[in-house]
């Protein structure tokens, strides 16, 4: 990957559209943002390569819990405690119960209008000859269920496993994934998770212990995912960010090597340490800021705001649900 890779691509974006309710945009930035559907439609018409990045917010309206913060715990844990290699090594039974519960929730969930709007946008882009790439931080598979294709799943998938021994990756939608997990994983049940290792999901090839094929805290993205993300952002001139505030995640690792040619949405940074480093970089290139950068912010539920902003009506959404 080129040294500036993902970072350079991201900073050359001319437009960022950000639907969110996760943070407050500072007053001076708010003045620079537009909620005009007409203006956004004009920008979309001129875009040649459209990239959509989605996060937990788009699936929350389908009833998918985030397991973060107060009220979002599974038993006495949040995801940062269970979604780690160390937690799996220490108690694979507990981690598999957690993921069995997540698979159960997702298996009973349906895509919402936000997912269908993204699928409709992909179809529209292809019809108009525009490049379209969908990147998602979600592991639920609801975009594919809504009709989106070639989805880049940044954090992996609940519906795939990887062998801890031979590293084989396989799709697995069995519910339960193994007999020992049947009836396990209830969020309000506090008991010792002690399913014997040999009764947990095992590899069909070598009988090694399986783990969910998801990216856990402390792990790097897979090499192929990084390559596809870099390819997606190369030449992208319209980035739509839906249901997440973590767009910086796409290019942070190379950020300090990049010559900034456009403004950066500082409010997307949640980490004070990162914010201070980016702030310094922005000030050093202040002559470039806010010159050719148009931003849009449509705040509210993505299932409502996304179809409206994209001009996707009820008939088109209904058609997507039927296909």
Swiss-Prot record:
Record keyword Metal-binding present: yes
- List ligand-binding residues for NAD(+): 55-74, 137-140, 243-245, 302
Compartments in which it is found: Mitochondrion
InterPro entries per UniProt? DHS-like_NAD/FAD-binding_dom, NAD-dep_sirtuin_deacylases, Sirtuin, Sirtuin_cat_small_dom_sf, Sirtuin_class_III, Ssirtuin_cat_dom
NAD listed as a keyword:
yes
What is the main EC category here? transferase
Q: Which reaction does it catalyse?
A: N(6)-malonyl-L-lysyl-[protein] + NAD(+) + H2O = 2''-O-malonyl-ADP-D-ribose + nicotinamide + L-lysyl-[protein]; N(6)-succinyl-L-lysyl-[protein] + NAD(+) + H2O = 2''-O-succinyl-ADP-D-ribose + nicotinamide + L-lysyl-[protein]; N(6)-glutaryl-L-lysyl-[protein] + NAD(+) + H2O = 2''-O-glutaryl-ADP-D-ribose + nicotinamide + L-lysyl-[protein]
The positions annotated for binding Zn(2+) are: 163, 166, 203, 206
What remark about domains does the record contain? In contrast to class I sirtuins, class III sirtuins have only weak deacetylase activity. Difference in substrate specificity is probably due to a larger hydrophobic pocket with 2 residues (Tyr-99 and Arg-102) that bind to malonylated and succinylated substrates and define the specificity.
Q: What is this protein called?
A: NAD-dependent protein deacylase
* Residues that hold substrate according to the record: 99, 102
* Species for this entry: Physcomitrium patens
**The protein's required cofactors:** Zn(2+)
GO cellular-component terms in the record? Answer: cytosol; mitochondrion; nucleus
Domain Deacetylase sirtuin-type per the UniProt entry, residue ranges: 34-323
Q: Which UniProt keywords apply?
A: Metal-binding, Mitochondrion, NAD, Transferase, Transit peptide, Zinc
Q: Which residues form the active site?
A: 155
Provide the family line: Belongs to the sirtuin family. Class III subfamily.
Q: Name one GO molecular function term.
A: protein-glutaryllysine deglutarylase activity
Q: Cofactor stoichiometry and binding?
A: Binds 1 zinc ion per subunit.
Q: Its biological function? A: NAD-dependent lysine demalonylase, desuccinylase and deglutarylase that specifically removes malonyl, succinyl and glutaryl groups on target proteins. Has weak NAD-dependent protein deacetylase activity; however this activity may not be physiologically relevant in vivo.
């Amino acid at each position: 990957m080129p040294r500036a890779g993902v970072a350079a691509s991201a900073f050359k974006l001319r437009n960022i559209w950000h639907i969110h309710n996760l943070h407050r945009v500072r007053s001076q930035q708010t003045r620079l943002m537009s909620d005009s559907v007409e203006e956004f439609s004009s920008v979309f018409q001129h875009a040649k390569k459209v990239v959509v990045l989605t996060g937990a917010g788009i699936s929350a309206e389908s009833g998918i819990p985030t397991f973060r913060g107060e009220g979002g715990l599974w038993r006495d844990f949040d995801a940062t405690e269970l979604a780690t290699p160390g937690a799996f090594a220490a108690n694979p039974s507990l981690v598999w119960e957690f993921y069995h519960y997540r698979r159960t929730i997702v298996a009973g969930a349906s895509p919402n209008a936000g997912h269908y709007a993204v699928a409709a946008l992909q179809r529209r882009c292809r019809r108009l000859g525009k490049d379209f790439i969908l990147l998602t931080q979600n592991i639920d598979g609801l975009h594919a269920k809504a009709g989106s294709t070639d989805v880049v799943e940044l954090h992996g998938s609940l519906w795939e496993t990887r062998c801890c021994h031979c590293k084989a990756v396989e799709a697995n939608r069995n519910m339960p994934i193994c007999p020992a997990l049947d009836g396990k994983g209830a969020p309000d049940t506090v008991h010792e998770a002690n399913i014997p290792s040999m009764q947990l999901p095992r590899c069909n090839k070598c009988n090694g212990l399986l783990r969910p094929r998801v990216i856990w805290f402390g792990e790097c993205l897979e090499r192929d995912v990084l390559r596809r993300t870099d390819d997606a952002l190369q030449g992208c001139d319209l980035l739509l960010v839906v249901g997440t505030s973590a767009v910086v995640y796409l290019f942070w690792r190379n950020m300090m090597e990049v010559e900034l040619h456009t403004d950066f949405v500082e409010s997307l940074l949640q980490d004070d340490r990162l914010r201070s480093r980016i702030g310094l970089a922005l000030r050093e290139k202040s002559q470039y800021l806010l010159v050719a950068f148009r931003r849009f912010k449509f705040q509210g539920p993505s299932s409502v705001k996304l179809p409206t902003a994209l001009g996707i009506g009820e008939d088109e959404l209904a058609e997507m649900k039927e296909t």
